[in-house]
Amino acid sequence: MTQEEYILIGKVLGVWGISGGLKIGVLTDFPERFDAGNELLVGRKLYTISQTNWQKAQVIVHLSGIDDIDTALELKDALVEIPASALKELPEGVYYDFQLIGLEVVDLSGVKIGQIKEILHMPSNDIYVSSYGVKEALIPAIKDVVKEINLKTGKIIIDPIPGLLD
């Protein structure tokens, strides 16, 4: 497996306690990835989760082989990843963020608007942040605007609502 085939699911924010717990900022919609017994790559090294404790949007994990604060401190700011082969299959029309970032955004007539740079997860709907000249376009991920997402062609076709690109 090449290094490009790993998917980011979190980042080590700090240590928790003297027994080597790691406080991880979670970047996945599947919190069960952090259940005890699962394997994670932390700093590109494979570990097994021995214990988990949730605290709001963060999780405290204890990993096999990390049992003191000094060893845990070496992993501060490390990326937490899983192999791409461990990704859950999503329903049709639902995508992982990494699949959308970098896609070209075009309007109904094929005119290039920009490229997806970021996805903002808002309560009502996601917002696709696209480059747009020297500015950014904030594209609501709703059916009235986003007409097609085609991973094979690498394009998102939109029908901009009035004012969207002003």
UniProtKB/Swiss-Prot annotation:
One of its GO terms (molecular function) is ribosome binding. It comes from the Bacteria. InterPro entries: PRC_barrel-like_sf, PRC_RimM, RimM, RimM_N, RimM_N_sf, Transl_B-barrel_sf. SUPFAM superfamilies: PRC-barrel domain (SSF50346), Translation proteins (SSF50447). Its main location: cytoplasm. GO terms for biological process: ribosomal small subunit biogenesis; rRNA processing. The keyword rRNA processing applies. It is found in: Cytoplasm. Residues 92-164 form the PRC barrel domain. One of its GO terms (cellular component) is cytoplasm. Keywords: Chaperone, Cytoplasm, Ribosome biogenesis, rRNA processing. Binds ribosomal protein uS19. PANTHER family: RIBOSOME MATURATION FACTOR RIMM. An accessory protein needed during the final step in the assembly of 30S ribosomal subunit, possibly for assembly of the head region. Essential for efficient processing of 16S rRNA. May be needed both before and after RbfA during the maturation of 16S rRNA. It has affinity for free ribosomal 30S subunits but not for 70S ribosomes. The PRC barrel domain binds ribosomal protein uS19. Belongs to the RimM family. This is Ribosome maturation factor RimM. The gene is rimM.
